Amino acid sequence: MMDRRRLIALFGGATAAWPLQLRAQQPGRTYRIGALALLPRDSPAYVALFDGLRRQGFVERQNLTIDPRGFGLHVEQFSDVAAQLVKAQVEVILPVGDAAIRAAQQATATIPILAIADDMLGAGLITSLAHPGGTTTGISILATELDGKRQQLLIELIPGVRRIAALVDSNTKAAGQLEALGDAARARGIELSLHRVAEPDEIVGAIDAAQAAGASGLNVLSSPLLGSQRQLIIERAAVLRLPAIYQWPEAAEEGGLAGYGPRLVQVWRDEMARQLVKLLQGVKPADLPVQQPTKFELVLNLKTARTMGLTIPEAMLDRAEKVIE
């Protein structure tokens, strides 16, 4: 691999690493948190989060209890598990995605909610970024804007492309967002087909349908569902030799053709952990601004490109922060 540029800190003012020390904790107290997500407990996101908490002095089985029931869920389980977490008196609930956030908000009006989602303000989950109000704060990852940017990059990655597809989580994407992608594609003379999924077992069929529709490239739109099934998508795209671009740069390091966005590990290890620690220390969520990523990375995988018979334009290679040979 070669780094084309030095990766800058992901969030303005966020610290990349902290000393291993306790910070404003009550001696002898154990803190209890609970997730509400499609992601499994061993996903890179949670591994990064727990590492960030450890760096801040919050260590599982020492002074931190992580309720096990909220990992690896299906959407229809969110409401029941949210109610269980409230009954268990967790001190913070950590939902991922709009549906999980709404379930947590409906379950409690008092327990702090630290969330990560595509567009928390646009979805009506908070009242403002600077002053979110209520019990919910967290990270809004600019998904709508980044989905459009990834579509643009995908078109530039495939010389002469005339037709592309988008893999869509039907639980999260609004019609207006998808219309904007279609308008942007048509403005460049590109035909865009949409392939919706609501459950993991629909993903392979949707990717197959995209290729059958004549798509020469696939834009994997941001969503908790598609993020949790990233390896499945990478593997299916490889079998079909279908170039695809993903929400997180790490996807290209795992065998995908391209990834563009903020670093998943840094979002969770640095910013999510920092905000969670503040909530555990007693800061009110209404007073904790919702954060947005400010630094993004393009990673390209030349090995994957070669297996797909794709020659990436030199101009694209020059733009990438990292190229995997």
What kind of feature is each model-predicted range?
Residues M1-E325:
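Short hydrophobic alpha-helices and adjacent helix-cap/hinge residues
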